[in-house]
Amino acid sequence: MALGIKEVLSLETSAIEERFHLENNEGAALLFSGRICDDLPGGAFLYTNQQTLSLGIVCPLSSLTQSRVPASELLTRFKAHPAVRPLIKNTESLEYGAHLVPEGGLHSMPVQYAGNGWLLVGDALRSCVNTGISVRGMDMALTGAQAAAQTLISACQHREPQNLFPLYHHNVERSLLWDVLQRYQHVPALLQRPGWYRTWPALMQDISRDLWDQGDKPVPPLRQLFWHHLRRHGLWHLAGDVIRSLRYL
């Protein structure tokens, strides 16, 4: 379970198009990873709308309990980041809210998600899927809702609303939602590995610093640079992250 904090900021359409290099009613969706919640799991997002921006962070509750920084302060720090600050300058806050986001995937789904006259959809069904590259929330909720609608229509037509679970389970398993849930069922555990938020950012930072160093010595060959920092940051742990990613993503 994660906590999402979102703020909606007002900005003229022309300014949005200029800052995000958009035209012809295009939109942009930016996802951020790294030290959003210090060196603990967490991410952030910035979406463009017609005349507003949607900006926020999403951090697992386990990260928030370990972090010494309040959740609201994490959002403030994210907004002040040099990569984000120019994109949201001269905006006005219109909305501010928080929401618990279930990102556990397939293994967090309730065993019984329908019954006598009731069924679960959306967050209650745990239909949000974090693929590690994108977060599929709204589209998967709509896909689950379509399966729910098909179930209710069939139950009403046959006058059998007593036990919806067998039919709903059948419709969910036939939907895109089930395919996506199965495909990325191990990703939630993969994203909890601390290396993604601690070791990998430090590795990339060290390599970039040495690669662009303008000191009095020539820059070492790239392969030598990579090998040096890979060993220094723990080659086998990094290799484990890569192997798991190739297996699960």
Model-identified regions with their sequence ranges:
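FAD/FMN-dependent oxidoreductases across multiple families
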Residues: 37-40, 50, 63-147, 151, ...
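Exposed alpha-helical structural elements
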Residues: 4, 73-74, 83-87, 163-167, ...
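Short coil/turn segments at secondary-structure boundaries
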Residues: 19-21, 89-92, 181-188
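Active-site-proximal substrate-binding core of FAD-dependent oxidoreductases
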Residues: 128, 143, 147-199
